[in-house]
């Protein structure tokens, strides 16, 4: 097992390198970098379709004093669109500040060296370290990921067991219909539907539309703080849990059905064991292997992929919304740092998931690839 863990840890190096290399190459060919973002704001031009969405985050950059170098000369030429009216020296100053005065391979190597030391630098437009930004946004995304995963498991496992025990019944058929319909609805579309129905859209005004807590949260008694916290989380968690709920329920059902049909179940029943004794004394442990072992990866999936659109729709200031705004604003330090952190956590959690299999079922041996 130790050799397997070491191999997996060593395999993380080329995996992380490949992820960062692909992202870096894609960014090099993407139109509109941070320099063009600043130029567009100084000249009043539009850099693309996302400029109206990305907000005014570039305004903070202009307040640093670089805007004073934006003197106009008629003869200036530049590789940047909209920069013909700006001083070339000012353009060079922008390139130096953003690090684009160096060739791409040198910038990539420097980025990898800094990331190995967990030095992610500062945001281009917020004048705050990337780690500080991540620490500020992490609690929101953690709250969504943890509660969504727990809710999914608490409902899906009992429901999946019930469906397996009543396989082919009316209960199994209508619950499967509801689950499939729920799985087919995209999470962001379901979130919008919840807002329309329950957040003051057109029908009921039962839940808040935005934020993780109320503005007067610090003034509330402790028990009211808890209620207010879950009041704000209700709709986002339901929207995120829809697709995961369907997947986990069907996975649990199929796992139990596979175990129930095995020979040892018939042997246990022949020895006089009751239905519950067979189910919870023999079947449950084996059937729950794949379900429990998948908990870390399910949490990471909810934490990283499910929260992006949900945080944006419900205006929750978490890592998903931070990454979305950073991509629009071409805030590359934040984009690459969040990608690096998410990818690193992802590969580590995948290793933990594999090790969880061996902890639940010692018969599994990754060295020989046998069970």
Roles of regions detected by a PLM:
Residues 3, 47, 62-85, 158-182, ...:
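Cytoplasmic juxtamembrane interface segments
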Residues 5, 9, 90, 94-120, ...:
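Hydrophobic alpha-helical segments of integral membrane proteins
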Residues 12, 137, 141, 177-180, ...:
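Residue-level signal for discrete positions within transmembrane alpha-helices
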Residues 23-29, 92, 179-211, 232, ...:
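Membrane-water interface segments at the C-terminal ends of transmembrane alpha-helices
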Residues 69-74, 82-85, 89-157:
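An internal, D/E-rich "acidic patch" concept
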């Amino acid at each position: 097992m130790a050799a397997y863990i070491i191999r997996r840890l060593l395999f993380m190096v080329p995996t992380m390198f490949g992820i960062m290399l692909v992202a870096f190459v894609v960014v090099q060919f993407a139109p509109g970098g941070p320099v063009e973002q600043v130029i567009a704001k100084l000249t009043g031009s539009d850099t693309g379709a996302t400029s109206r969405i990305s907000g005014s985050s570039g305004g903070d950059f202009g307040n640093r004093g670089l805007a004073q170098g934006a003197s106009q000369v008629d003869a200036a030429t530049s590789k940047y669109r909209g920069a013909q009216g700006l001083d070339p020296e000012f353009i060079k100053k922008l390139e130096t500040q953003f690090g684009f005065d160096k060739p791409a391979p040198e910038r990539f190597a420097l980025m990898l060296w800094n990331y190995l030391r967990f030095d992610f630098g500062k945001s281009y437009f917020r004048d705050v370290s990337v780690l500080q930004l991540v620490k500020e946004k992490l609690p929101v995304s953690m709250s969504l990921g943890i509660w969504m995963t727990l809710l999914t498991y608490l409902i899906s496992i009992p429901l999946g067991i019930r469906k397996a025990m009543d396989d082919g019944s009316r209960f199994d058929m209508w619950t499967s219909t509801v689950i499939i319909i729920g799985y087919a609805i995209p999470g962001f579309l379901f979130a919008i539907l919840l807002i329309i129905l329950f957040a003051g859209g057109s029908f009921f005004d039962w839940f808040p539309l935005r934020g993780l807590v109320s503005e007067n949260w610090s003034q509330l008694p402790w028990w009211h703080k808890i209620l207010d916290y879950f009041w704000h989380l209700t709709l986002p968690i339901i929207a995120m849990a829809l697709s995961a709920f369907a997947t986990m329920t069907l996975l649990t059902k199929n796992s139990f059905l596979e175990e129930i049909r095995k020979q040892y179940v018939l042997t246990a029943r022949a020895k006089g064991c009751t239905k519950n004794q067979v189910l919870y004394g023999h079947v449950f442990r084996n059937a729950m292997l794949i379900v429990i072992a998948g908990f870390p990866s399910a949490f990471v999936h909810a934490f990283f992929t499910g929260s992006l659109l949900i945080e944006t729709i419900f205006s929750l200031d978490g890592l998903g919304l931070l990454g979305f705004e950073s991509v629009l604003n071409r805030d590359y330090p934040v984009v690459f740092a969040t990608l690096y952190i998410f990818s690193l956590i992802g590969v580590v959690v995948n290793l933990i998931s594999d090790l969880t299999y061996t902890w639940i079922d010692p018969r599994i041996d990754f060295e020989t690839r046998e069970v």
